[in-house]
Amino acid sequence: MGWGLLIFMVQIGDTIVSFDLFQEYFCCNFSHCRGICCVEGDAGAPVLFEEVEKLEEALEVIASEMTPEARAVVDEQGVVYNDRDGDLVTSIVNGKDCVFASRDENGGCICLIEKAYREGRTPWRKPISCYLYPVRLRKVGDFTAVNFHKWDVCSSAFIKGRRKGIRAYEFLKEPLIERFGREWYDELLVVAEELKKQNML
């Protein structure tokens, strides 16, 4: 596949990977953040066109578990909408809460789609953008930019990652493989090892 180091970016195949993905420590800390990333922000989670049908199929499974407000939004505009940048995103309630978010018995935010997936009620986990977070993808010409999004609501994840010695690319192994494939991820590991040899990590 081949790779090349750019200033603060690494090219792997047809992707350009942010150096932050290698450098930053990251490990989700749900017990601290309580899943706030599902209910904060001013737009829904990015959705691929081919994921819309999967969202609609998942809706049939989890509709009864959604809040009345979320069901009303979905009834009015569907499971997705175009945000101010024209990107397709999940529908939201009151300008911030994902319609597929709910609360567990301890008040933490959970994804109803992923809950159904873990319980074997749906074959699909959730949108790849959610699975990949804090990575965000963006098309740049013929390339896909693999960017690392730093958000203050994830501050505890940076602390936990550093404490455990887990880099972002390691924590995100499974979603990165799901999105880009095993060969791509193996190349990412080669890059990481080379960066370590050069004392860049």
Where on the chain are the PLM-derived regions?
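Short loop/turn segments that flank or connect secondary-structure elements
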Residues: W3-L201
